[in-house]
Amino acid sequence: MARNGSLEEFLGVAVDAAKRAGEIIRKGFHETKHVVHKGQVDLVTETDKACEDLIFNHLKQHFPSHKFIGEETSAATGDFDLTDEPTWIVDPVDGTTNFVHGFPSVCVSIGLTIGKIPTVGVVYDPIIDELFTGINGKGAYLNGKPIKVSSQSELVKSLLGTEVGTTRDNLTVETTTRRINNLLFKVRSLRMCGSCALDLCWVACGRLELFYLIGYGGPWDVAGGAVIVKEAGGVLFDPSGSEFDITSQRVAATNPHLKEAFVEALQLSEYVS
């Protein structure tokens, strides 16, 4: 049950925050970026920090009793505590590497969990002005129009999305590429857009039939898109086929017709060389 407001109110405030942050992203997209390396290939910019501050300040003004988890604050400390309390989970710039390179797949992702369940989701792509929204039990929308997952039922006719992450040790790279190589024999083609949140939304609106990612950064990568996928009629689960856990850094999404075949293909891809 919502606390300190209705779910519609939560969504409205989150949309406002996402659009304000999106304006910062849009203005900075073609400018010179001041980049800091979080790891070998993981980047953060001044825009990430400015957007997270803006979003949290806006949300805290409206919902001061809520909890807050953000990529730039939580990832930096390696510490976040997801409780049953209403918790806003934010990735201020999902697709920072794209942003740095001027590659137009960048978004703001804002999710609200209540009882650890993704309940409200907002994903805003300011470069092409696409706003994905969802409320648990009330549908998913793209720029105010209802969206649904693809009705495709054949794996071989399906478009698969994934990402390669930012870890570059030999074992991770070998495992990732082996998995992709094996899956390519099962699907029509593969896409990597560089944003987990957008990948999930593209499943929700039918642009992708399949998506999986193993080893993403944290709950901020999926909190916004998770409820949007479910409300669009999709299914969200662990790549092993078990129940999705927002804190596990493992996610897969598709439509109900493809889930069984997709899980089988994912499992086989782990062992076939």
Swiss-Prot record:
Biochemical pathway: Polyol metabolism; myo-inositol biosynthesis; myo-inositol from D-glucose 6-phosphate: step 2/2
Tissues expressed in: Expressed in seedlings, flowers, young and matures green fruits. Detected in roots and stems.
Cofactors that this protein relies on: Mg(2+)
Chain ranges passing through the membrane: none
Record carries keyword Chloroplast: no
Binding site for Mg(2+) 2: 91, 94, 221
Membership in a protein family: Belongs to the inositol monophosphatase superfamily.
The name this protein goes by in its record: Inositol monophosphatase 1
Natural source organism: Solanum lycopersicum
